[in-house]
């Protein structure tokens, strides 16, 4: 979890920017979106396979 201590003479915008950078660096939001709802293993495999096919098709262009 990202933790930000607001420094002396630091604006709230700067502190918020540091917090957002920390959250994105930790991958907190990605983890939240991944666990937002349960995905059955079979569906997860299918999505992963489709993403790989799409990637390969895009790479072949």
From Swiss-Prot:
The molecular function terms in GO held by this entry are: structural constituent of ribosome
A GO biological-process term: translation
Q: Which domain of life is it from?
A: Bacteria
Q: Which residues form a coiled coil?
A: none
Q: Which Gene3D superfamilies does the record associate with it? A: Ribosomal protein S8
Q: Which GO terms describe its cellular component?
A: ribonucleoprotein complex; ribosome
Name the keywords, alphabetized: Ribonucleoprotein, Ribosomal protein
Q: Which PROSITE patterns match?
A: RIBOSOMAL_S21 (PS01181)
Pfam families, sorted: Ribosomal_S21
Similarity annotation = Belongs to the bacterial ribosomal protein bS21 family.
Stated name of the protein: Small ribosomal subunit protein bS21
What is the protein's species of origin?
Leuconostoc mesenteroides subsp. mesenteroides (strain ATCC 8293 / DSM 20343 / BCRC 11652 / CCM 1803 / JCM 6124 / NCDO 523 / NBRC 100496 / NCIMB 8023 / NCTC 12954 / NRRL B-1118 / 37Y)
Gene this chain is encoded by: rpsU
């Amino acid at each position: 979890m990202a933790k930000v201590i607001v420094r002396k003479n630091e604006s709230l915008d700067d502190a918020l920017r540091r917090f957002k950078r920390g959250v994105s660096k930790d991958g907190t939001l990605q983890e939240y979106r991944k666990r937002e709802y349960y995905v059955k293993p079979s569906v997860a495999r299918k999505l992963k396979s489709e993403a790989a096919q799409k990637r390969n098709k895009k790479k072949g262009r």
